[in-house]
Regions:
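NAD(P)-dependent short-chain dehydrogenase/reductase
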Residues: 113-115, 119, 123-175, 180-184, ...
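Active-site segment of SDR-like NAD(P)-dependent oxidoreductases
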Residues: 9, 61-63, 99-104, 136-142
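Conserved Rossmann-fold NAD(P)-dependent oxidoreductase catalytic core, especially the SDR/UDP-sugar
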Residues: 57, 81-113, 131
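N-terminal Rossmann NAD(P)H-binding glycine-rich loop of SDR-like oxidoreductase domains
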Residues: 3-20
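Glycine-rich NAD(P)-binding loop of the Rossmann-fold in SDR/ketoreductase-type enzymes
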Residues: 71-82, 112, 116-117
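Adenosine-cofactor binding site in Rossmann-like domains, unifying the SAM/SAH pocket
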Residues: 26-46
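NAD(P)H-binding glycine-rich loop region in Rossmannoid oxidoreductase-like domains
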Residues: 39-75, 104-105
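C-terminal substrate-binding subdomain of Rossmann-fold SDR/epimerase-dehydratase oxidoreductases
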Residues: 163-267
């Protein structure tokens, strides 16, 4: 099968590429596409020349602290819009990597530019008949290039490696930590069951809310706590996927304990 994957230099895209490359013909599209002045026509040229049956659109600016509106919307909305329209026009499968950042701090509206860019793109994808997957807190192998956007598990392991003190917020934030292998299985499930799920968004998570303390206790990493006054304004203290919003018949296979155990084999 001929498949396009965007963002294969990134964490999720690289894992998806590794899963699919041995049995499919893959075209990779990455950030360097924006080095071309007429980048949107360059995208159409690549898509038309390769003529894929499936497009996994994983690539995006994932920096939740980015404040440049033009930069963010070009990469996260305009790029998505053009690929979604191409897939709709030619009847190709389009699977979009969305985000739980769509929910913001009150489950209603995104609370930052990244969240808004992903939310607006997701709404367009659904309108075009694609499948959007809202990932929660993804962790796993190959996330080292994410820097400050890497998972809590990766960042804490790095701090331990370099002998740095680890401090947590005293209010005990809870997150839905989802292992990368479950994210990849959700993408493949969406591809294989596309027509039943097209024109919809779905959540991809473990379905469990766990604390940062849980992560560190499983990894056997010691920690202390910040003062209450150190908590950033607007900090999100709770996320959890709802199994009612998962794709029918798709289920995660890893809880936090099993996911971290498998993760440690790759570090």
């Amino acid at each position: 099968m001929k498949i396009v994957i965007t963002g294969t230099n990134g964490f999720i895209g690289k894992n998806l590429l590794n899963e699919l490359k041995d049995s499919n013909e893959i075209l990779e599209i990455n950030e360097d596409i924006f080095n071309v002045e007429d980048w949107y026509n360059e995208i159409y040229y690549k898509l038309n020349k390769f003529d894929p049956q499936v497009v996994f659109h994983v690539g995006a600016c994932s920096d939740t602290l980015e404040t440049d509106v033009n930069y963010m919307m070009t990469r996260n909305f305009e790029f998505t819009r053009r690929v979604a329209e191409w897939c709709q026009l030619l009847g190709r499968k389009f699977i979009y990597s969305s985000s739980a950042a769509n929910y913001g701090t009150n489950d209603e509206y995104p609370s930052n530019l990244y969240g808004w860019s992903k939310y607006t793109a997701e709404q367009y994808v659904v309108k075009c008949g694609g499948v959007a997957l809202r990932y929660f807190n993804v962790y796993g192998p190959l996330e080292d290039q994410k820097g400050k956007m890497a998972s809590v598990a990766y960042q804490m392991l790095e701090k331990q490696k370099h002998g740095q003190e680890i401090k947590l917020f005293p209010k005990k934030p809870q997150r839905d930590f989802v292992y990368i292998k479950d994210v990849i299985s959700a993408n493949i499930f969406a591809m294989e069951n596309y027509h039943e799920n097209m024109g919809q968004w779905y959540e991809v998570g473990s379905g469990d809310e766990r604390t940062f303390e849980d992560v560190l206790d499983i990894l056997e990493i010691p920690y202390t706590y910040h003062d209450e006054k150190d908590i950033p304004k607007g900090y999100q203290f709770y996320t959890k996927s709802n199994p009612m919003n998962w794709m029918t018949e798709w289920k995660p296979q890893y809880n936090l304990e099993n996911g971290l155990k498998d993760y440690l084999k790759h570090i």
